[in-house]
Amino acid sequence: MSAPLHASAALAALVLVAAPLTATAQVNSFAQVERGRYAVATGNCEGCHTAPGEPSYAGGRGLETPFGTIYAPNITFEPETGLGRWSKDDFWRAMHEGKGPDGSNYYPAFPYPHFTKMPREEVDAIYDYLATLEPVRKEKPENELPFPMNQRLSLSVWNWMFFEPGVYQPDPEKSAAWNRGAYLVEGPGHCAACHTEKNIAGGDKASEHLKGGQLDNWSAPDIRGGEGGGIAHWSEDQIVEYLKTGRNEHTAAFSSMAEVIEYSTQLMLEDDLRAIAVYLKDLDSDARQPADRPGEPVMTAGAAVYFDNCSACHVADGSGVPRIFAPLSGSGKVNDPDATTVIRVILEGARAVPTKAHPSPLSMPAFDWKLSDEQVAAVASYVRASWGNAAAPVTADEVAALREALQPTVQ
Amino acid sequence: MARKLPPVDVVLVGFGWTGAILAQELTDEGLEVLAIERGAWRDTPTDFPTTTAPDELRWYWRKEMFQNNSRETLTFRNNRGQTALPMRRWGSFLVGEGVGGSGVHWNGQTWRFLPSDFVAASHNIDRYGPLPEGMTVQDYGVTYDELEPHFDRFEKLCGIGGKAGNLNGRIEAGGNPFEGWRSAEYPNPPMHMTFSQNQFARATAELGLKAFPGPSANMSRAYTNPLGCQLAPCTYCGFCEKFGCGNYSKASAQTTILPVLMKKPNFTLKTHNEVLTITLDKSGQRATGVRHVDLEGNEYEQPADLVIVCAYALGSTRLMMLSGIGEIYNPATGEGLVGKNYCYQVMSSAEVFYEDKYTNGFVGAGALGMAVDEYNGDNFDHTGLGFIGGGYIANWTTNARPIETHRTPEGTPTWGSAWKKAVADNFLKSTSVGAHGASMAYANNYLDLDPTYTDVYGRPLMRMTYDFTPNDMAMSGFLTERVREIAELMGGREIKLNPREGPYDSMPYQTTHNTGGTIMGTNPTNSVVNRYLQSWDVPNVFVMGACVFPQNAGYNPTGAVAALAYHAAEAIRTQYLRSPGPLVQA
């Protein structure tokens, strides 16, 4: 027998053995897998389920919560360490009810309170897509949670208090675009996970919905786009541009939002981004209370620090260079009542997300080694009270506390 | 014993401007490209952020921006009668090291050579008769018309600001009327000029000269290049030459190519590895790859189908010598070509001091200036002048960096309280007009391997034998007189002339425009590489950089270096890959 014939005989045997699997593969049509790939993008699964420098979706990334560090599991279909033995029903239960195959509760760091809004077909498509990924063997590190947070039973109480399973129900009074946007924002997009203030138990404060939150020493700004909202001055087009390219006339994305744009929104269809914009622009808020202006000595000191260190990029009048160096005038982050992000960016610098549209990772350098707590407080107070901005002053103590919190912990 | 690594399609030796250009072009072609860089990874926010970029002491005076010459340097002498000694501290030129190469610390003056510069030998012989004894000027083997699209490409990559003087053959007001035709206007408008440039424009107009804005790689406005990379408007801080730009305002590999290139799966960069030699097969006519060494001294064999040398003019020439590709030039016999036609740049200037006008030189940028081109190349009749070539004359306000900048009038003591007072009195009230003179090749100016001194790996250092030539001195004398005429009309209280005087001194900073050594040309008897920068001897080796210039024109070289690199890349993409072998038959 010649070698090629031998090879094809072996191939035939392989096909026979693999026949039942082939049947499954046929069900997972290209369209179904692509639907799943897109659904995964809408939920930014890759962002949390990928550790830096490790294979995508193999988990191991730690999410810092006020209660401790929770690690994202491996969601490739590796049988021992991933989802390889899960059925579609198991996967649905996880996404819809927040429970593992053994009935145990997940921590809501996994945003099932949002994913529950996704319909079964969408969740099945995600399952089918994840099944096509190269399986990676990778154990999930143990969560670092103190008692009683490490008792998963306590989560039943949490679920009873804060969680209501149920697929998104469209509002017939609203347009199709609004409903699509609401679904994406409240469902897979899980925007509230960062942008809504939490109660003491880590549940969303309903009255503060999308008015800004704090996570992992970052403050996420108010993203309500209606009257009185944090991005009331953004147009629909500007919201779409921001989500698509990571930049718009007002700002550039960095830190956690950089990930959201990199793995999620820049991959989404423009119609969907527009739907998100339509929904956000419909969320009105009460007008903010004007904040106290810093005293003149602080403004004078802040202006001096600003002109020496910041004005080359952000320009003397805070107008920045749109899409390159963030304008500070009118910035949602600068005007956030919670100054954490402003202080942190001055201390650590920031790196604008490189996207397909804007590949340059334009960065601001760190000033922690150069400016004292008093200087950081003065310049932060100055930018928060200049050029139409009207947010409360920052104190040197706040700067010192954040500086301390950002120190790398010695293992 | 060197460890053998898996083969790649292309290995690039050095990762500055030309390395980044070639990597971007050849990865687009689908090739697996590896760049090997002896220095470190460098990027704006990590290595020269605004908070440390303007550190004059660190970057320039303590030479942190440049090649570490305790590991490798050159030896230098003025002529063959002397014994060359190692340059233990950079002076007249500043060789780069690390990702981005010297293109990180350039000023950004981005010129096109004149059409006649590419045919300097035949053009001048036609017009003025035979070249003088000892002058070895020759044609490039490529014409301006062939390079035009590649100049254009580089200008768009960088976002060069300027004003066209010749748009498709039509002379445009406000631009350089002598330049070769351009297929398009500059992608950005000129920089904002200052008082000094306005005085220069007025003075040159009075003399009947046509001043135009210097072509600038410092951004005159926010710019997004064709790859999508973003550059920010220049802040005129004056820390360009000798410094990295912290504001993303100067075109460099980092700001124009790397954000896109570094994400490509078919591109790999290896830093802190030095290529020791290009390896050849037994025939000596085919490169098999390179041998390189890491910082721990481990050696590697890197097989590759194509080796492209992008290691700056001096490094590339030396690597060709150390690899035994071609014969090293010997001025005594005229034999050999590698190392021949080393050229430089012949600079002179005049300083202008004002009594009551502020020039505010601290508002500067590397390529902020106005220039005239009447006395460059063959833009004027050289009959009876005793030299060929010329240079542009410009008023740049590149900087007023406090340690470096201390213009003082004629007769000021060089130290002490009178000197200090003069520096203080004139710091804000002075400017300078410079001539950027060409450098014509002579048989006695050359590069070879030093017989005595070696680098950290025991390889011979390259030896530079160079002095200003009779052509240089006559040309510079002529240009300096033109500089004087202009300076005197700029409305100052007094001027001070700084003529170029020989012999060439390797210590005072002049320019980092080292050219020649692996010159290009029309056939293997007059050149090391052909018109596509391909080695005549080993056709799977290409050499990029100003080392291929047969002689240097009266302009800064980066524009021409990049255009030649794009021209070579196009030939590799469209011709060489289809049929690997010599692109020009000898």
Identify the meaning behind each predicted range:
Chain A
Residues 8-20:
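Bacterial N-terminal signal peptides
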Residues 34-37, 42, 50, 54-82, ...:
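Sequence context of c-type cytochrome heme-c attachment sites
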Residues 89, 96-184, 188, 198-199, ...:
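Hydrophobic, ordered structural segments
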Residues 23-27:
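Boundary at the C-terminal end of the N-terminal hydrophobic targeting segment
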Residues 30-64, 159-160, 169-199, 204-212, ...:
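Sequence/structural segment immediately N-terminal to covalent heme-attachment motifs in c-type
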Residues 193, 199-202, 206-319, 324-337:
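Extended non-catalytic domains of envelope/secretory-pathway proteins
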Residues 38-50, 73, 90-97, 108, ...:
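C-type cytochrome heme c attachment motif
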Residues 69-85, 90, 96-121, 139-144, ...:
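Axial heme c-ligation environment in periplasmic c-type cytochrome domains
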